[in-house]
A protein has these predicted regions:
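Zinc-dependent deaminase catalytic domain
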Residues: 1-169
Length: 169
């Protein structure tokens, strides 16, 4: 029997909720090797925007190269729009709303996305994985964030939590 006088105990924390939305957004990515999602949240825990990595609007992703290796123009790298950038670009409100906002992402942002995050006015980055920590791109990202007072931290407590979503009537 459920005690209706007490709140439910196994609900998602705000961090878990927003990271789950970022992960759900990543499922829209058509990239066969890397799916990344992003969720931007204001200081009142309201979702401002979401994004995922993929081809630019209007670019046919059936002809889009998804390879990771080979001639650079035949790989995904010069064409793909990262999740963080898509989330920033997808927002249709005032950029002023990003002041003091947080961005939740699967993967620590690259240096190009770090610049976008800083320019947007986002003040905190929460990520799940930093698997490219030793790359120049991520080292540069951390230098940029440190110099511009953007805090960042790994969301550790969520690592072993499973959120199951079933779409059925």
């Amino acid at each position: 029997m459920v005690d209706v006088c007490k709140k439910r105990e196994n609900y998602l924390t705000w961090d878990e909720y927003f990271m789950a939305i970022a992960k759900l957004s990543a499922m829209r990515s058509k990239d066969p090797s890397t799916q990344v999602g992003a969720c931007i949240v204001d200081k009142n825990n309201r979702i401002l925007s979401i994004g995922y990595n993929g081809a630019p609007n209007g670019y046919n992703d059936d002809i889009f190269p998804w390879d990771r290796e080979g001639n650079e123009l035949e790989t995904k790298y010069p064409y793909v729009v990262h999740a963080e950038r898509n989330a920033i670009l997808n927002y249709r409100g005032s950029r002023k709303d990003f002041e003091g906002a947080k961005i939740y992402v699967d993967l620590f942002p690259c240096n190009e996305c770090a610049k976008e995050i800083i320019q947007a006015g986002i003040s905190e980055v929460i990520y799940l994985s930093d698997k490219y920590a030793n790359t120049n791109s991520v080292i540069a990202s951390k230098r940029l964030f440190d110099a511009c007072n953007v805090s960042y931290h790994e969301l550790k407590d969520i690592k072993n939590k499973e959120v199951i979503l079933t779409l059925k009537k």
